[in-house]
Amino acid sequence: MPIITIYQGASGEGQELAETVAQGLGYHCVGREVLVEASRRYRIPEAKLNEIVEKGPHWWERLLQDLRPYRVALQAALCELADDGKVVYHGHLGHELLPGIGHVLKVLLTAPIEFRIEQVRSRQNLADAAARHYIEEVDKARSRRLMAMFGTDWRDPNRFDLILNMSRMRREGATRVIIEAAKLEEYQPTAASEQVFNDLALGSRVHATLLASPDVQGSALEVRAEGGHVYVKGRIDQGSEDEVLNLVKNVPGVIKVTSDLYSVPPDAFFGP
């Protein structure tokens, strides 16, 4: 059975639906747990991760802030939580955190704006105008964040496998549709798709470990894994190559390391 991600905008019952689907499949349901796991493992304050996930960046943040450490830490944490494949993730990053994996069913919950306004109004006791403003602001913030982190737009239907109009069905009906879709042959794990997942999990775990190290944080590194063989390349601070390689070798699952690292002396930018 596939890993399932469920995305919904600022309204509705995405979490409740995810929990119902997970119960029906015997899966575990995760959402905020990804933030907690990433914070615990990779030394990123949970409040900062929550800010990164929930709030859209201003234009100057997009220029000045490197979002890689947060993206990679969240990816590594989700891979860790989804290691057994029996996961339903609810949130607005999951469908982008597991790219290229055939046994992931990506679900988008949508509805007309009037339906969403009614849901937010009743859930948060807001007037219609306030509910509309809330939805618009949250949607814009999440759109900016996804574009900044992944270069993608959540409104692109091609990013998802299944799109459900929640104004047309109850939670029970949506649950049945998702569970039946999860049984389709196209979304079942294969040896190839499981290898892609394992490579992504190991590569992101190594990358997150490097970015969490104070001695490596300023480096510009690319990391990928293939069957336990980890490839690391990029610019590092002068004299830090041994530290980088030791960090990589100590990550569980790493069998072999190939590096292509270079450093630039501090005075190289100032001339004679």
Show which residues each predicted segment covers.
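N-terminal targeting leaders
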Residues: G100, A111, E118-Q119, A148, ...
